[in-house]
Structure formats: C-alpha cells, structure tokens
Amino acid sequence: MFFASDNQGPVPEAVLEALCVANQGYAASYGADAITLDVVSKIQTLFEAPDAAVYLAATGTAANTLALACLCPPWATIYCSPVAHIQEDECNAPEFFTGGAKLNLVGSYDKLTPDALEQALLGT
C-alpha cells in the first residue's frame, strides 16, 4: 500500500472492497452506525481510554488541523519549524481552521528547540 498522500492516488483494492462491504444495507447517520461505533470502541481500547471522545476525519490535513483548532484559540500562535509538516504540507489549513497564525522558528537543523521557543515567548 502507498500512503504518501491520502488524496493523490487510488485506494488499495482491499480498501475499496471494504468500502463496498460497508455500503451494503442501511445504517444510522452521523457516527451512530455499527461500523463507526466499532472503530471508536477499538480506538478507545487501543489507547486504554474507554471514555475518550473519538472523531474520525476524511483526510490527514483535516485531522491535523482540526486537532490544532481544538488546542489553539483564534488569538493564539502555532509555533513550528519552517520545515514542519504543518508548514510544508498543510498549506493554509491550520490558519483557516484555527483562525490563528503560524510563527516559524528556526533552531538547530531547522528543528524547534526549547531555546528558540523561549526566545519567541519572551519576545527576545
């Protein structure tokens, strides 16, 4: 299977077959169907968090940016490296979903470092 992108190529045959099986019959909507409830239960079990709220997203960009939106209020800033995935691959989706902004910080090897973050937070 090829997972470089969730929206640039065809799905593997096994995925398409599973979609066809899931498409049989009728099911409740908005996450109340048996398949979604089963997935939620399995994720809660996997993470040993039986009370965890689980939300499924159609793409990696949606999952990443919605998660950031839960953490980042509109007046806040997302600190990241200039080569971070959210900077390089998510385009303006983080700003769109959070209403905030990204601030690129350069550390050693373009990795976000505690020193770079401290300087940004202190305005130095």
PLM feature spans:
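Extreme N-terminal starter segment of soluble prokaryotic enzymes
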Residues: 1-2
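Short polar catalytic/cofactor-binding loops
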Residues: 7-11
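Conserved PLP-anchoring active-site segment centered on the Schiff-base-forming lysine
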Residues: 70-88
